[in-house]
Structures are given as C-alpha cells and as structure tokens.
C-alpha cells in the first residue's frame, strides 16, 4: 500500500544572525531527505510548508532540531495522496512573514498563546474582539464564528486596518488567529506595540485547532485555505473540494467550476470580465504547459504559482 505524503507546516521566530550561511546546508538537508516545498529564512526566524515521506519529514525536523535555537520549532502535519509541491527551495528574506513595520519583533514581545483546547472558551467571551488576520480570499473559504474579516489583500495592509478601526482604550481584549500561527503571532507583537493590553493568539493556528478539537465541539465554519496544491483542507484535514484559478489565484468551489465563465486554468467567475489580455494569454500558455506535462507524466515545468510567494502560514 502506498504511504501518504506528509505535509508539514513549520515556523519559529528566533534570532538567526547567520541565516545567510544557513541557506545551503538547509537546502542540502531538504534534498537529502527527499523534501519538496519552500522554506523562508530571515534574521527573525524560519517559516514554510514542505512535504515528503514520513521518514523524510522526520529527517528534516531532526536536522532542524539539532540546532539548539530550533529544538522546539512549531510544526503541524496533514496528509495527501499526491505531491503538493514540485520544487525544493530555501529563500532568504527580510521577514519570514511580511508585515512591513519596522521594530516589530516577536522574539522580544508577543501576545498570550492560547492552546486549541482553550480557544472556544476565549472567543465565547463577549468582551473579546476576534480578528481573522488572513487575507480576504482565505477568509471567504472559512473562518471562526463571530470573527471580524479585515478584507485585506496582503498582510502589509493589516496595520493600517487596525489603526483605522480599533482603539486600545476601547478594545481591551483582542484574540487573533491565522492558518498556522505565524501571522497572528507577529500581529500580536505589533498590537502590543500599539498599546493594546490583552492580546491573545491561537497557538498552532487553525490547522492545530482542526487537528485537536473534535468536530462536534468546533466553532470553525467552512474549509481552511492552505498554501499548496490541495488549496483547502476540511475539518478532518482531508483535502477539500476547492481548486484555484491560475489567472486570479482565487479559490474556486464546485459551484464556481460549473459556471459558464469557468475555463480550467484560464478564468473563473471571479475574474472572467476583469482579466487583462496579457494575463489571459499567460494563463492560456501556462495551462497548455500543464496539460503537456500531465500527458508526459511529468511535474509541471514551472509549477503552480499558488500565491506561494507569501508562504504565510
């Protein structure tokens, strides 16, 4: 029986002054263990989602944890039948998740971590302001009951949204969440710096919550967007029914794919009347490459660009 592929989302805020020198040995460790996916490293830490065999993932985690600075690196796992990534990359970054505000450092100041088992009680408190720190296309797939959607298109927009809508003197308790924990952890550091006193964030993010909290007790509604070719996962962490439009990158549902405006790899109901001719031509060419690669039983030569550049778990 074929063993399922293990998908591991991992991150840790930790000072890595030698991060530039870490790139090549980390990349070699990924190659040696047969790992696909992308890891981002910066002076503030490491972040990314990777996939491989059980032995391969364990080997990579052992390599990382051999460094005393990463012995407690956070990671969440799920499984799939097909390889969700086509390439193996380690990228050097200024930030492992881009907020774009100087001085925000979760290594120095961070909110209160909340375990998944305690999350329901916290967000049931009427005095708690619950904010989804993810982008609009992610929130549209699923979110927690009662969560505020900032309707941001990138994490860089989050600080301005907070300044325009909330006041530390009025909003005394704030709880935030994201896919794997990294965005809300950095957001908590930012909000503490802005004067918010009680700031909480979901430890391990939505993925850890779905893993640990039974469906009969859940306050989660819908699927969870993930940054790989699965597009979404259900509450049991199995692959969801969404695809993703290669032209506009929006997740598309079963209903969307039944629309007359949906053309696989080229357009969807969300973008069919707004695409530039250049984007449309590019999508058509990319789809031809994908179909040719599939016919030859080869990985897509340029990969699916599933907004992975952000890798914002």
Curated annotation (Swiss-Prot):
Catalytic activity: uridine(34) in tRNA + AH2 + O2 = 5-hydroxyuridine(34) in tRNA + A + H2O
Entry GO MF terms: oxidoreductase activity, acting on paired donors, with incorporation or reduction of molecular oxygen
Span of the signal peptide: none
SUPFAM superfamilies, A to Z: Rhodanese/Cell cycle control phosphatase
Pfam (any one): UPF0176_N
Domain called Rhodanese: residue spans: 124-218
Entry EC number(s): 1.14.-.-
GO biological process, one term: tRNA modification
Name of the featured protein: tRNA uridine(34) hydroxylase
Organism encoding this protein: Pseudomonas fluorescens (strain Pf0-1)
Gene that this polypeptide is encoded by: trhO
């Amino acid at each position: 029986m074929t063993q399922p592929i293990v998908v591991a989302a991992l991150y840790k805020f930790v000072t890595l002054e030698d991060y530039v020198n870490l790139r090549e040995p980390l990349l070699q460790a990924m190659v040696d263990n047969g790992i696909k996916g992308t890891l981002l490293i910066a002076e503030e830490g490491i972040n990314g989602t990777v996939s491989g065999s059980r032995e391969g993932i364990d080997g990579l985690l052992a390599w990382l944890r051999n460094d005393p600075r990463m012995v407690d690196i956070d990671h969440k796992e799920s499984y799939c039948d097909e390889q969700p990534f086509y390439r193996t990359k380690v990228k050097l970054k200024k930030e492992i998740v881009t907020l774009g505000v100087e001085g925000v450092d979760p290594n120095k100041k961070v909110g209160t971590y909340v375990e998944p088992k305690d999350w329901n009680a916290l967000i049931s408190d009427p005095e708690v302001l619950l904010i989804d720190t993810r982008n609009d296309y992610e929130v549209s797939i699923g979110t927690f009951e009662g969560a505020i959607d900032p309707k941001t298109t990138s994490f860089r927009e989050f600080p301005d949204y907070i300044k325009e809508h909330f006041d530390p003197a009025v909003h005394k308790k704030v709880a935030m969440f994201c896919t794997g924990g990294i965005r809300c952890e950095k957001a908590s550091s930012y909000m503490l710096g802005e004067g918010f006193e009680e700031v909480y964030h979901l430890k391990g993010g939505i993925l850890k919550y779905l893993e640990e909290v039974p469906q009969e007790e859940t306050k989660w509604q819908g699927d969870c967007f993930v940054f790989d070719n699965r597009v979404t996962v259900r509450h049991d962490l199995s692959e969801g029914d969404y695809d993703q439009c290669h032209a506009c990158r929006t997740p598309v549902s079963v209903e969307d794919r039944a629309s007359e405006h949906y053309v696989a790899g080229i357009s969807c109901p969300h973008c069919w009347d707004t695409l530039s001719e250049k984007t449309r031509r590019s999508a058509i060419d990319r789809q031809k490459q994908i179909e040719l690669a599939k016919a030859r039983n080869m990985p897509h030569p340029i990969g699916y660009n599933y907004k992975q550049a952000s890798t914002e778990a």
